[in-house]
Amino acid sequence: MKKEYINTGKCIWCGKEKPEVSFYTAPHIVPKCLGGEEIGKDICDDCNHAFGTAIQGSPSVDAMFREVFEAYRFFLQLRTNEIKDSRRYKSCLFSYFRKTRTFKINNSYSINALTRQFKRSVFEVFLQKYHLVTNDGNNPKFQAVRDFARYNIGDLRLFYTFNNILLTENTPLGFDENVTFFMTPKMIDTMERTGFYSLYLFGHNFYLEVLPFTASMAGDQYLSTEANTMLVRAKGNESIRLVTSLRDIDIFLDRFVK
């Protein structure tokens, strides 16, 4: 009998149930090529396929997550001398120029389109991980996440912790290491109180506005408090910054090049 990846049998994205939709495709939460082993539940084959399909003017949502975090991992290895030569970096989307510390987009995509697809990808992995842990991904309170990540409707804020040190503790560097991110009861409680979920992966910390109404009331104070503990004051430009462009998240870790 063919394996199904279900708990409730109701897709957390489109809300459809068996037999209207099927659940036979293994939905990796973090892409397997990045070392992700966790398999999500209740993501129907149609929605799983949609996240992996390019749309006109943009690469797929899943491709953007993979490209950004592959770059993060490679250049983290480069900056920590695990890898010696930046010319080993290969990407379908980006060309990186070591001498000028600049990059170009290899296709006709705009940086705005790539930024939006990346943001959608981060919210995708959030809800799939949340559902795996809580079995509550169909909760109506996440409708804004579903609209944005799955259907490209509306917008949600994403913030990035910009530090001038490498946060490598508990960060898998090898390309064969198992990669995951945490979803603890404490983190869920913080999310319920502030509207934000904190995602830490490959040494980078993001804050996702997953409950916009709650975030509108308590989010600014939460981010201000987080800045006091998460930022290491070194050069004076450290901040928890709103992501409006891929340049805001320093994919190639150029701030660590001397």
Which residues fall in each region the model found?
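Short, flexible, mixed-charge glycine/proline-rich loop motifs
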Residues: 1-8, 33-38
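Short cysteine-rich clusters marking metal-coordination/redox-active sites
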Residues: 11-14, 44
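Histidine-centered nuclease catalytic patch
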Residues: 18-40
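Short Cys/His-centered divalent metal-binding micro-motifs
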Residues: 42-79
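Conserved C-terminal region and hinge/linker of Rieske [2Fe-2S] proteins, especially
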Residues: 82-83
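Short flanking/linker segments adjacent to small metal-binding domains or redox-active Cys/His motifs
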Residues: 86-116
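C-terminal, charged low-complexity interaction regions
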Residues: 117-258
